[in-house]
């Protein structure tokens, strides 16, 4: 998938991108308890969202979705996120970072992934987190992952109209291979837990 993102970026924008990945997630224990300030036990999955990004010298940002095969342009000083459009998540994160004082510049973006949209694996959280990570690295913002997870949650709530909790973006930002995490949603403390199933596996139905 990383190669697909890189090649698509080269075709559309004739430049070399920074490529960043954020995973989707499953939840093993604690469904719907994150927005009740309870405990949850999510784990990252190998599928997720990839973004390719680079600065441009234009007056607009350009975003291309591999899944929808659409390009969308917007200006950083006049963003209008609207429900039901894939670019809402991009403009939502940019709006919140701008409001937090991060000096964004115009950029080109390609997004794609191998996670089913609407499949219950938090593709929207993975998109917001991957974009946040990419912007933070591209512009040397060094935004803490916890803050990125909170921005991703707020973006979905304010701009996509989804009453989501913190679990999805937090698991996407902090998930590690071979581990789940016990997350206390009261204070966002978490503990990584090794998941070694031996000869067994997990089947999601």
Each predicted region: which residue ranges?
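ATP-binding N-lobe of GHMP and related small-molecule kinases
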Residues: 1-121, 125, 132-145, 150-154, ...
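Mobile "lid/hinge" segments at catalytic clefts and subdomain interfaces of large enzymes
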Residues: 164-167, 171, 175-205
């Amino acid at each position: 998938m990383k190669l697909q993102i890189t090649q698509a970026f080269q075709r559309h924008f004739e430049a070399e991108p920074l490529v960043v990945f954020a995973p989707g997630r499953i939840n093993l224990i604690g469904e719907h308890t994150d927005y009740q300030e309870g405990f949850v036990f999510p784990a990252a999955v190998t599928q997720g969202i990839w973004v390719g990004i680079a600065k441009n010298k234009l007056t607009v940002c350009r975003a291309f979705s591999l899944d929808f095969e659409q390009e969308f342009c917007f200006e950083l000083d006049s963003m209008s996120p609207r429900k039901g459009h894939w670019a809402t998540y991009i403009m939502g994160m940019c709006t919140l970072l701008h409001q937090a004082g991060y000096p964004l510049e115009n950029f080109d973006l390609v997004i794609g992934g191998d996670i089913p949209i609407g499949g219950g694996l938090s593709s929207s959280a993975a998109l917001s987190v991957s974009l946040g990570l990419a912007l933070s690295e591209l512009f040397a913002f060094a935004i803490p992952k916890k803050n990125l997870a909170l921005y991703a949650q707020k973006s979905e709530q304010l701009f996509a109209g989804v009453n989501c909790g913190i679990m999805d973006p937090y698991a996407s930002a902090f998930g590690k291979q071979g581990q789940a995490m016990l997350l206390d949603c009261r204070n966002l403390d978490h503990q990584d837990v090794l998941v070694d199933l031996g000869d067994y596996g997990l089947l999601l139905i």
